[in-house]
Amino acid sequence: MKAVVYKKPFEVAVETVDDPKIKHPNDVIVKITSSCICGSDLHMYEGRTAAEPGIVFGHENMGVIEEIGSAVKTLSVGDRVVMPFNVACGFCKNCQRGYTGFCTTVNPGFAGGAYGYVAMGPWVGGQAEYMQVPFADFNCLPLPKGDQFEADFSLLADIFPTGYHGAELADVSPGESVAVFGAGPVGLMAAYSSVI
């Protein structure tokens, strides 16, 4: 398959890489239809984070399930899904407490995992044609079939939930005024989340 591969600071290339495979019964393979470029990807691209050459970027992904592992219970081939940026198991102590960004199962030697990001586990990113998603019942959010609202739904992978979480942590209540400093994509979603 084709994928965006990091070479060195300020250099990426579209290259042929190995197709992902089902490695565990709870995996799915997703044909990627959208993958956003995050500021975190730019940290690696610009050399501000020590990324190893060969990493495939992309932790804001959505697509259609092409293949399914034998233990997957809530998803089917053909389901349109978006994957949150962090990889989590859903059953460890941290996941059970809602701290999925600090999952202790998905990344040997470090709490927390993400697709296509340095030191965040073995998970290949989604700036590619296909992607393996582990613990798929937990890591795939099913969407309506079709291709309507593709750009809108892609925000569910990282940008919108990050902004929403900020508004939630601020304990915003109806009628309150809110100031957002740094109104880039995530800041705009925090402002929007304060309205809803």
Regions found by a protein language model. Name each.
Residues 8-10, 24:
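Residue-level recognition of beta-strand termini and adjacent short loop/turns
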Residues 40-45:
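Cytochrome P450 core scaffold surrounding the K-helix E-X-X-R motif
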Residues 3-6:
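A short beta-strand micro-motif
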Residues 1, 26, 175-176:
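Nucleotide donor/acceptor-binding cores
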Residues 80, 142, 147-196:
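Mid-domain Rossmann-like dinucleotide-binding core that forms the NAD(H)/NADP(H) cofactor-binding site
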Residues 18-35, 46-96, 101, 123-124, ...:
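Glycine-rich beta-strand-centered segment in the early N-terminal region that forms part
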Residues 38, 84-151:
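Cysteine-cluster motifs in flexible loop/terminal segments that predominantly coordinate metals
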Residues 11-19:
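Short glycine/threonine/proline-enriched tight-turn/helix- or strand-capping micro-motif at secondary-structure
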